Each structure stands twice: as C-alpha cells, then as structure tokens.
C-alpha cells in the first residue's frame, strides 16, 4: 500500500508539473507573440472629435485582422501637427483632413510634404450647425457672430477658410472665430448660447451629434445652390457632397454642400511590405470596420483611387495590393 500510494502521489505531482509547464509555456508563447507584433503609430487629433474615434476603430480592426501588427492610436493636435510629425518620422501613420493634405502634398503655403497616401478615410461635407430654436438660417445670418471653427490644429478650420472664401467671405474678419483646445469643447458653447454656430464636417461627427441631440435640437446651415457653384468654381479641388436625409437627428431633407476627402497618410520611409499589409487588412475587414463605425464604410480601396489627387501619391506598397485586386494596372 505504501509503495502504491507513493507511486500515485508521484504520478499526481508529475502531472501537475506537466500542466504548470504547459501553462507557463503557453503564457510565454503568448507574451512572445505579443512582443513580436510590429508596432505602428497612428496620429489622430484632440479628444472629442471624429479623428480619435475613427483612429480607434481602424486600429482595432487592423489589429484583429492581422495579428502580426499592433496599430497604436495617439492623440495629437490634429492635421496641422500630424503632417510635420510624419515628415519628422515621429509617426508612421496619421489622419489628415482633406484641405491640410491638399496644401501639404502640393506645397501650398509651405514646402511640399514628401508623404504617401495609405487610404482615403471619408468625405467631409462642410456645414454649420445651430440650435434649432435660434434665428439663424443662412450663412449671411452668421456674419459678425461668434462661430466655433474647431480645434486650432484641425483641418476643418482650413476647409471653412476655403468654403467661405469661395463665397467672398473671410473666416477671420467676417465672423468672430472661436478656436478650441479640444474639439469636444465646441458643442457646449452652442448649447449654452455662447456661440451662434459650430462649423464641422462628416456624417456621424461627434460634435454635430452633441448639438443635434441637445434639448433644442439642431439645424444645419449650408451654402445655397448658387453658393455651391461659386465655391467649386473658385476652388475646384473641393467636391460636391450630399448628406442623405436622416444622417443626423432631426435632419429630414438631404443637404447639398461641398467638402473634401480626408486621408490616412504615411511617412515617406514606411516600408512597402508594411504598407501592403496595412492596405490588405483594411480591405479584407471593410465590413468589420463599417460595423464598428458606420462613417468608415467609405474607407474603401475604390475611394482611395478616386479621391487621391494623383495616383502616384498612393504608397507603392498600397499600389501593389491594388494591382493584385485588379483595380490598378
């Protein structure tokens, strides 16, 4: 009995040791696998706006689709800071609003930025929102009034400058412009009556939703049809954009305005193979990304091709993947 009991205890001890070894071995393997994931930094913008929400959705989607990658979003001051951070190699990827990308890639008002396009994000229709109980119904009604034009480093402020210029207005002289530290600070100014309107863009933009869902509701103000044509004639790089009815609470009619496409840009030295893997993950998980964030349904390979100012601005690694899809020659 003593010998049998000793053997039994020895067998149990051996089994327990084996289980522990297996457990810790698997833990080490998992830890090692996590450590081996390639980290990719992604610059977004200030908290409270659309870029951080979009960046988080993109990062989670890519990381889930390609476990060898670890895309890590980082709050920044927005498009105006993201471009120089990419140029300095301090970010791998960054979200850049359309007008900021246009100026940077074409060297308007600054040296030309030597960067690549990874993907088109979504179209940003430029609009004002006011409280539904306010007397303001046109852009002219807002002249001389305090208007929130977004965070100081946001590309949306640049979009406002181009749109208003096309109407013969000056953003900084014809209005009382308010620029913010954080995009999320804008809605309270309108809701509390300290600002007449909030300028912004894109369907699902959190500050627009905050005003539209406020106690008084919201009303959008856009250029009229003649104004849209004036803007497009003055600044042809802008595009006509329609916001479908029902895109926001209380919005019962389509809104026809102008805007531009925002982009995910990359540093110039991002390896071709890495850009290829990122583009592939985005394409393969397009439906997953759309479910995470409905506005990201526009993050599609076809839109990248259509929205890029020139095809040679698309990263060579992305171009290789698009050729494999049969979308580029």
Protein language model features and the residues they cover:
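An extracytoplasmic/periplasmic, membrane-proximal ligand-sensing/linker region
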Residues: 185, 192-193, 202-220, 230-237, ...
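Conserved N-terminal glycine/acidic-rich loop preference
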Residues: 35-40, 50-57, 82-100
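N-terminal hydrophobic or amphipathic helices and topogenic motifs
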Residues: 2-72, 113, 287-329
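Short beta-strand-centered segments that line the small-molecule binding cleft or hinge
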Residues: 113-122
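Bilobed "Venus flytrap"/periplasmic-binding protein-like clamshell domains
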Residues: 39-65, 69-70, 124-192, 308, ...
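Pocket-lining segment of extracytoplasmic ligand-binding domains
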Residues: 98-100, 108-109, 134, 171-270
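Short, solvent-exposed loop/turn segments at the edges of secondary structure
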Residues: 121-125, 258-259
